[in-house]
């Protein structure tokens, strides 16, 4: 055997050995990065508070308390309450609390996160192994074990394109992919940005694939926290070059990341909902309504819309017009002036867009603005969307000029204040005050079209690489 043939054979055997290593127990791997493994000077800056704080995911519980009407910052101390009333209240609520806990830790967890079921993981194991081999062989993926602040081990895969960024420089941008409730990075949503030429970091929810733990919201947030830290401090991407992409239930961790790290570059949400409660009520018996609402609020409070409104950066929503998973019938009010094909009225992405625009541009979305956006949301295909947009004769150039003029005015006013955020003047913007109803409708339609893109696809259809786009920037 010649020397060249021997080297080729050795490389082939080494590849087989590396691939085989992916199939053994991930717990045997050494830890590559911990949530507190930070050696960056100046991290006491408030904008990086989550990078050095053990309670990085405390924001989940703050929103949890707010959802239950118990804002920890405003409620009186317990010492001021009647001890007897508190005791009686706790006794009355004990049966429902026990029922909620039992439901959440049995049937509820399997319904919300079916990918954490052992039988599903075993059934998908051959496909997961093939997916790992593909990412390693074709894209030179690097698998790593991260440890979150709760001790869970998080399985990740990183594909680095910085050495060959492409003609558009996409490889210099990192896309962190947050999978759905039955998705794994080995065969999940990361394929679209990966094939589009971006650097990609995929990770599995706690309890999915090689990740340990259970996929409850707090654990998911802790996992997302260490993934973001890994991207910034070990992979050395600047925050402005990091895009968070969440598909389906991955929108919760995606919005949590951008809420906690507002300096991150952009957010893309694909087939995502605003709140889990309406979707849970759709599939559960009506007689269980009280128990379902309590269980979701206490154990699965995936309040995506609330977290989305806390992020000041560029956002793009991808709505799938044939999506029946994140849809509840008849939620958006019916408007007789627009006929649609298909059922897009109940898509929870509609509510997500409305909440976002109402938070960022309250004057534009008042009355006429909200009505015309609801009408636009009922368009189920590109032809209807374009026809409605043309009917109102929206002047894109005027809308852009108006928004830029308002931003420049805010910039001058905020030059000597601390309200300047990482993406410019903080929201809400009160642009549109004093404009006619017609002009407000134009701005509302313009903003809606820039923040939401329709895709003629079902919930689980793989996203095409050309459909993965970065959000619009003013």
UniProtKB/Swiss-Prot annotation:
GO molecular-function terms, A-Z: monoacylglycerol lipase activity; phospholipase activity
Gene3D superfamilies, sorted: alpha/beta hydrolase
GO cellular component: nucleoplasm
Active site positions, chain numbering: 248, 323, 423
EC number: 3.1.1.111
Keyword Repressor attributed: no
Intrachain disulfide bonds: none
EC class (word): hydrolase
One GO process term, biological-process aspect: phosphatidylserine catabolic process
Keyword Disulfide bond: no
AB hydrolase-1 domain boundaries: 175-293
This protein's UniProt keywords: Hydrolase, Lipid metabolism, Phospholipid metabolism
Catalytic activity reported: a 1,2-diacyl-sn-glycero-3-phospho-L-serine + H2O = a 2-acyl-sn-glycero-3-phospho-L-serine + a fatty acid + H(+); a 1-acylglycerol + H2O = glycerol + a fatty acid + H(+); 1-(9Z-octadecenoyl)-glycerol + H2O = glycerol + (9Z)-octadecenoate + H(+)
Function: Hydrolyzes the sn-1 position of glycerophospholipids with high specificity towards phosphatidylserine (PS), PS-PLA1 enzyme. Also hydrolyzes the acyl chain of glycerolipids with a preference for the monoacylglycerol (MAG) 1-acylglycerol, MAG lipase. Plays a regulatory role in cellular lipid homeostasis by modulating genes involved in neutral lipid degradation and in phospholipid synthesis and composition.
Protein family according to the UniProt entry: Belongs to the AB hydrolase superfamily. ABHD16 family.
Name this protein carries in UniProt: ABHD16B
Organism in which the protein naturally occurs: Rattus norvegicus (Rat)
Highest classification ranks of the organism: Eukaryota, Metazoa, Chordata, Craniata, Vertebrata
């Amino acid at each position: 055997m010649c020397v060249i043939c021997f080297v080729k054979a050795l490389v082939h055997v080494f590849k087989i050995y590396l691939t085989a290593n992916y199939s053994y127990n991930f717990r045997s791997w050494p830890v590559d990065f911990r949530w507190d493994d930070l050696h960056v000077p100046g991290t006491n800056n408030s904008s990086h508070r989550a990078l050095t704080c053990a309670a990085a995911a405390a924001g989940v519980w703050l929103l949890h308390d707010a959802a239950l009407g118990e804002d920890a910052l405003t409620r009186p101390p317990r010492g001021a309450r009647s001890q007897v009333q508190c005791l009686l209240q706790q006794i009355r609520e004990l049966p429902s609390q026990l029922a909620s806990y039992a439901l959440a830790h049995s049937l509820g967890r399997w319904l919300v996160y079916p990918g954490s079921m052992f039988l599903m993981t075993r059934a998908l194991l051959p496909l997961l192994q093939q997916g790992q081999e593909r990412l390693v062989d074709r894209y030179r993926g690097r698998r790593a074990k991260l440890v979150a602040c709760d001790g869970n081990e998080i399985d990740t895969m990183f594909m680095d394109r910085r050495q060959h960024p492409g003609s558009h420089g996409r490889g210099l941008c990192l896309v962190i992919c947050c999978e759905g409730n039955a998705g794994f990075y080995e065969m999940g949503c990361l394929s679209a940005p990966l094939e589009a030429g971006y650097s990609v970091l995929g990770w599995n929810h706690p309890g999915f694939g090689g990740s340990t733990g259970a996929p409850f919201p707090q654990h998911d947030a802790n996992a997302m926290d260490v993934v973001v830290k890994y991207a910034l401090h070990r992979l050395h991407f600047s925050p402005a070059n990091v895009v968070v992409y969440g598909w389906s239930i991955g929108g919760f961790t995606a919005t949590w990341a951008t809420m906690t790290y507002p300096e991150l570059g952009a957010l893309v949400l694909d087939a995502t909902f605003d709140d889990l409660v309406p979707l849970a009520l759709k599939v559960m018996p009506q007689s269980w309504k009280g128990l379902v609402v309590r269980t979701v609020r206490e154990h699965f409070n995936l309040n995506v819309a609330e977290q989305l409104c806390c992020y000041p950066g560029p956002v793009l929503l991808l709505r799938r017009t044939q999506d029946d998973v994140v849809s509840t019938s008849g939620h958006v009010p019916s408007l007789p002036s627009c006929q649609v094909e298909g059922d897009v009225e109940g898509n929870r992405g509609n509510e997500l867009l409305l909440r976002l625009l109402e938070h960022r541009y309250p004057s534009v979305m008042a009355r006429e603005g909200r009505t015309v956006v609801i009408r636009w949301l009922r368009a189920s295909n590109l032809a209807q969307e374009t026809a409605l947009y043309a009917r109102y004769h929206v002047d894109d150039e005027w809308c852009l000029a108006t928004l830029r003029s308002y931003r420049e005015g805010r910039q001058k006013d905020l030059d000597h204040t601390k309200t300047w955020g990482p993406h410019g003047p903080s929201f809400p913007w009160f642009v549109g005050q004093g404009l006619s109803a017609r002009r407000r409708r134009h701005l509302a339609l313009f903003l809606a079209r820039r923040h939401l893109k329709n895709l003629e696809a079902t919930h689980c259809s793989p996203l095409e690489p050309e459909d993965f786009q970065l959000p619009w920037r003013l």
